[in-house]
Amino acid sequence: MNFLAHLHLAHLAESSLSGNLLADFVRGNPEESFPPDVVAGIHMHRRIDVLTDNLPEVREAREWFRSETRRVAPITLDVMWDHFLSRHWSQLSPDFPLQEFVCYAREQVMTILPDSPPRFINLNNYLWSEQWLVRYRDMDFIQNVLNGMASRRPRLDALRDSWYDLDAHYDALETRFWQFYPRMMAQASHKAL
């Protein structure tokens, strides 16, 4: 899962949106650095990452990547799941329009920015103003996201080419998303994530 899915599942679970978004920017034990609700959100994010990576649908999708891009498949798939969530938001969350959800999420996250790591602050400078969560529905934007990650981290250069794997397996990936994401939504709503 990437930013949008983590925020969405956190909302459904009544967990800290801030902690769920912050988690990738925190190493080790967050308990001494953040309030309990944010810590709980960080832990939820980590559980979701482990759960998602081990879902049969996700493991199968990783195998569809070519040998030269398979190493970055988990990252590429995380971004792609956000694409499908953004694209199908009105079906998955009909009572909370995506643009309203993005404003709500931003308000929640802004409360922790003063005490956040610089890389997280930097992300927030772009995430909200450039409407990333809404733009995830556009595959051209997904390609830009993958290229941007590859540019910032040379060891992840294969992300540029992983775009072709997404394109080649788009329909099958969308089918897998519909197989697992509604289950995760139900788990979140029952606070079972």
Swiss-Prot record:
A Pfam family this chain is assigned to: ACP_PD
Keywords attached to this entry: Fatty acid biosynthesis, Fatty acid metabolism, Hydrolase, Lipid biosynthesis, Lipid metabolism
Gene Ontology terms for molecular function: [acyl-carrier-protein] phosphodiesterase activity
Reactions performed catalytically: holo-[ACP] + H2O = apo-[ACP] + (R)-4'-phosphopantetheine + H(+)
Enzyme Commission code: 3.1.4.14
UniProt keyword Hydrolase, yes or no: yes
BP GO annotations: fatty acid biosynthetic process
Family: Belongs to the AcpH family.
Role: Converts holo-ACP to apo-ACP by hydrolytic cleavage of the phosphopantetheine prosthetic group from ACP.
HAMAP family named in the record: AcpH (MF_01950)
Protein name per UniProt: Acyl carrier protein phosphodiesterase
